[in-house]
Amino acid sequence: MSCQPFTSADTFIPLNSESSATLPLIMHHSAAECLPASNHATNVMSTATGLHYSVPSCHYGNQPSTYGVMAGSLTPCLYKFPDHTLSHGFPPMYQPLLPEDPTAADFKQELRRKSKLVEEPIDMDSPEIRELEKFPNEFKVRRIKLGYTQTNVGEALAAVHGSEFSQTTICRFENLQLSFKNACKLKAILSKWLEEAEQVGALYNEKVGANERKRKRRTTISIAAKDALERHFGEQNKPSSQEILRMAEELNLEKEVVRVWFCNRRQREKRVKTSLNQSLFTISKEHLECR
């Protein structure tokens, strides 16, 4: 097909008109816009009756390919768009269709900031790292001093913070086998637990100490009271509870003091008898050897 340049605008006859069946389709382009026929145009030429010229594919002139929405998937047009519609009809695709949401912008900035923080290397000589390396050993010593095992600590933390804490977690923390992030998180929790445990332990030791001081308090028994107790012991070395109460009232002593005195007196009597029997046995044995 030879191309003839025209200065006027392009003219065309649509294929769906009544005269398209008898008249050939004549399209005129400028010499610079002539393109080889496409496969689609060849198919149209073979199927249309009375069409004796190959039809060139649609050419959008200077229009970028991004302007045509799904241009690659659409069938080529059989006419040429005017230049003014191609250059002024559509906005550039690289411009945002909607204004950017400020919330989304803030989210992106926060995401970039967090990614930078993660990528920053950890200073191994920082005071935080040194404290994190020293605390596990200190925690272990104080935990053992309070009488708690790793299992006790894991169960106590699991009851408050969930099942993610266990004996294995405490063991790995004390052996410096956790990641930096998890170790920092667990250090804060264990510090608080240790303070509470030491407070409870201090209260318990205070109560136990008071009970021990009360138990170790000794009662002084007068000589007259001892003589009276010795006489009662000679008569009955195992008095009943009523007899002990009566003796305590007579001697102006506590019932527990009288009861303990009789217990100690029986033990001393038993030791004396045992020692005496051993002495007699030794004497008898020596006497037999002399014979």
Curated annotation (Swiss-Prot):
Domain notes: The 9aaTAD motif is a transactivation domain present in a large number of yeast and animal transcription factors.
Subunit structure of this chain's protein: Interacts with PITX1. Interacts with LHX3. Interacts with ELK1.
Keyword DNA-binding: yes
Residues in POU-specific domain copies: 124-198
Single GO MF annotation: DNA-binding transcription factor activity, RNA polymerase II-specific
Subcellular location: Nucleus
InterPro entries referenced in this protein's UniProt entry, alphabetically: HD, Homeobox_CS, Homeodomain-like_sf, Lambda_DNA-bd_dom_sf, POU, POU_dom, POU_domain_TF
Motif (9aaTAD): 5-13
Function field: Transcription factor involved in the specification of the lactotrope, somatotrope, and thyrotrope phenotypes in the developing anterior pituitary. Activates growth hormone and prolactin genes. Specifically binds to the consensus sequence 5'-TAAAT-3'.
Gene (name only): POU1F1
GO cellular component, one term: nucleus
Pfam families documented for this protein: Homeodomain, Pou
A GO BP entry: positive regulation of transcription by RNA polymerase II
Keywords: Activator, DNA-binding, Homeobox, Nucleus, Transcription, Transcription regulation
UniProt cross-references to CDD domains, sorted A to Z: homeodomain
Residues within the DNA-binding region(s): 214-273
Native species: Sus scrofa (Pig)
Family membership noted in the UniProt record: Belongs to the POU transcription factor family. Class-1 subfamily.
Protein name: Pituitary-specific positive transcription factor 1
